[in-house]
């Protein structure tokens, strides 16, 4: 399926920004969004998280559809659980583990989230600590 058809199938408000198509989605809708992306044969690219002043995280999931980037953005409140998509997209494992390492995110639906970039004895959330905003 091409990117235009997939956006139309998923429906909702998509907007073009920075060379990609974006959609805002509540955090509870991410697993459904991932399923729809998989049905549309979108390739999972990555997860990006950035911290906000109120200690929430802006999280975006990115998929590639034959060279067109479809990105879905959600807000994760402080201490909130992020739903895993690794059972839908196994390739999301490393991105979820990296997000855990850097932002101390806990994933609902994962048996474990072992460190990827940190040692097992390191405390997750190193990017939050460098900004002085430990979760």
State what each model feature region is.
Residues 1-135:
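Terminal low-complexity/charged segments
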């Amino acid at each position: 399926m091409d990117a235009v058809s997939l956006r139309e199938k998923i429906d909702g408000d998509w907007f073009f920004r920075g060379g990609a198509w974006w959609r805002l989605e509540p955090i509870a809708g991410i697993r459904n969004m991932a399923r729809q992306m998989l049905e549309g044969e979108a390739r999972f690219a990555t997860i990006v998280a950035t911290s906000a002043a109120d200690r929430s995280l802006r999280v975006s999931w990115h998929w590639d559809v034959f060279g067109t980037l479809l990105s879905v953005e959600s807000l994760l409140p402080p201490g909130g659980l992020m739903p895993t998509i690794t059972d839908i997209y196994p390739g999301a494992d490393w991105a979820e583990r990296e997000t855990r390492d850097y932002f101390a995110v806990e994933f609902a639906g994962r048996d474990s989230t072992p460190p990827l970039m940190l040692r097992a004895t390191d405390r997750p959330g190193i990017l939050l600590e460098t900004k002085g905003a430990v979760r």
